[in-house]
Amino acid sequence: MQSEAQSPRSSQICSTEPVFGGHAPRRVSHAVDVRWGGTLVTIGGAAPVRVQSMTNTDTADAIGTAIQVKELANAGSELVRITVNTPEAAAAVPAIREQLDRMGVTVPLVGDFHYNGHLLLRDYPDCAQALSKYRINPGNVGQGAKRDSQFAQMIEAAIKYDKPVRIGVNWGSLDQDLLARMMDENGARAEPWEAQSVMYEALIQSAIGSAERAVELGLGRDKIVLSCKVSGVQDLVAVYRELSRRCGFALHLGLTEAGMGSKGIVASTAAIGLLLQEGIGDTIRISLTPEPGAPRTGEVVVGQEILQTMGLRSFAPMVVACPGCGRTTSTLFQELALRIQTYLREQMPVWRSEYPGVEKMNVAVMGCIVNGPGESKHANIGISLPGSGENPAAPVFVDGEKVKTLRGEHIAEEFQQIVSDYVARTYGRAAAQN
């Protein structure tokens, strides 16, 4: 006969308070300040995890690029990277910066350099000054002896103009000389590593080795951010775990070429979420392939939602909504959830300054009586719409208390007004007190 101690029932009882842990403490890294005018965005140190993005315009088109940068900044991107690949693009950078400043958009610009960055930074000093940060790829900065010289020229430009850099390694453009040497060394081992491990090590050595060379050239550790981007979830997690263990530089997270739609979102969320949960990562970029005609700002929203759903930051009020089931044959709750979520995001550019704290608000839009009232009570504001066969009434809860029951054809409009009034009443008062 099974003893009391061995019974399944008793094994579920905990005699002491269990430890329910959240995400791990944040990895300690050097704080890197990225500035433009009066705007300061700190990456690493005690700063919050930053969300950044990249334009897909032709940088030589100064007007088109400035417009997209503004859209990304308005969506919440704290840094925006632009391609600087030609003399025409480099010449346009000061005009882009000037147009943004004229529009009141002070988001720092990051110049993305490959192959010829040393020449562009030398020949276009106004471009070098207008950028707030440089991205350098050690894999294509030059070959052989030229690599060291051209890398040094870019670091010297960063020192001259007092700009931080991201040394960004990518397995699609990894330094082939380094990889070949490491493969040869691996072949000579008594017990060779797997090829995948050699690739990981090459990525890490390229990043850290380049960073240490930059330090030798005079660039401070507080001016360097590292990244090692790959396109596989488990590959990214493995590389960053080891990279974070072996250096104290601030780290930029991103799953390169994540893809389109739900696949890209899921892959990026899985990889970045795992690392953030372990306290690894100081800034993120979601590399989504936008569908034709879709706004570029989608990658910013996904990045924000990753951080907010993990409890790391708050950007906009969150809408909790049930998935629906056989009890919810009406689409009313789905339509209302979408309407409220869209409304909240549209209001945030104004609310962010007028109603500080509103970004932490939770709104529940539920579809039936099973979880509707309970979930609505947990939110700041909640509504429980009637399911199939239920009384055609929708109780509304504010701060856990039922305050009203809505009926009829204008439930959506009335609930939206209740939300708006709550924001003004609750967060407007907080703003006045501050």
Curated annotation (Swiss-Prot):
Matches recorded under Gene3D superfamilies: Dihydropteroate synthase-like (3.20.20.20), Sulfite Reductase Hemoprotein, domain 1 (3.30.413.10)
Keywords: 4Fe-4S, Iron, Iron-sulfur, Isoprene biosynthesis, Metal-binding, Oxidoreductase
Binding note for cofactor: Binds 1 [4Fe-4S] cluster.
Superkingdom to which the source organism belongs: Bacteria
Record GO biological process: isopentenyl diphosphate biosynthetic process, methylerythritol 4-phosphate pathway; terpenoid biosynthetic process
Compositional bias per record (Polar residues), positions renumbered to this chain: 1-15
Top-level EC class as recorded in UniProt: oxidoreductase
Reaction catalysed by this enzyme: (2E)-4-hydroxy-3-methylbut-2-enyl diphosphate + oxidized [flavodoxin] + H2O + 2 H(+) = 2-C-methyl-D-erythritol 2,4-cyclic diphosphate + reduced [flavodoxin]
One Gene Ontology term of the molecular function aspect: iron ion binding
Pfam families: GcpE (PF04551)
Record region (Disordered): 1-20
EC number: 1.17.7.3
Keyword Transmembrane helix carried by entry: no
Cofactor(s) the record lists: [4Fe-4S] cluster
Positions bound to [4Fe-4S] cluster: 322, 325, 368, 375
PANTHER family in the record: 4-HYDROXY-3-METHYLBUT-2-EN-1-YL DIPHOSPHATE SYNTHASE, 4-HYDROXY-3-METHYLBUT-2-EN-1-YL DIPHOSPHATE SYNTHASE (FERREDOXIN), CHLOROPLASTIC
HAMAP family named among the record's database cross-references: IspG
Protein family according to the UniProt entry: Belongs to the IspG family.
Function: Converts 2C-methyl-D-erythritol 2,4-cyclodiphosphate (ME-2,4cPP) into 1-hydroxy-2-methyl-2-(E)-butenyl 4-diphosphate.
Protein name: 4-hydroxy-3-methylbut-2-en-1-yl diphosphate synthase (flavodoxin)
Record organism: Burkholderia mallei (strain ATCC 23344)
Gene name of this polypeptide: ispG
